[in-house]
Amino acid sequence: MKLAIDCPDCRKMILALPRRAGRGAIWLYRHSLSPLVGYHCRHLPTCSSYGDEAIERFGLWAGGWMTLARLLRCQPWGTHGIDNVPLTAPAGARWYLPWRYARWRGVNG
């Protein structure tokens, strides 16, 4: 998709909108639902911190898939412990194979 915008700063702002929307949803969860439900995350950093960092680092598409996998691992029979966002995207990850962005099992595998 090519944007017909002459202003380079405007182009950056428009391309950053999905990332900001994802991080905004996490902020809304942290300040509305999370205080009511309480702290129950089995990992460090918390799942919302993980999601915020993943979306900031990799964008809404890849970071969203990483966050989904982390949320599915954060359950009573799932993983626990220190589980940081990877520094780089996995080598086999492509936009049309989104499940390859995430670790579905294990911690920091």
UniProtKB/Swiss-Prot annotation:
Entry membrane topology: Peripheral membrane protein
Keywords assigned: Cell inner membrane, Cell membrane, Membrane
Claim: Membrane is one of the keywords in the record: yes
InterPro entries, sorted: Membr_insert_effic_factor_YidD (IPR002696)
Localization annotation: Cell inner membrane
One GO cellular component term noted in the UniProt record for this chain: plasma membrane
Function: Could be involved in insertion of integral membrane proteins into the membrane.
PANTHER family the record matches: MEMBRANE PROTEIN INSERTION EFFICIENCY FACTOR-RELATED
Family statement: Belongs to the UPF0161 family.
Descriptive protein name: Putative membrane protein insertion efficiency factor
Source species: Rhodopseudomonas palustris (strain BisB18)
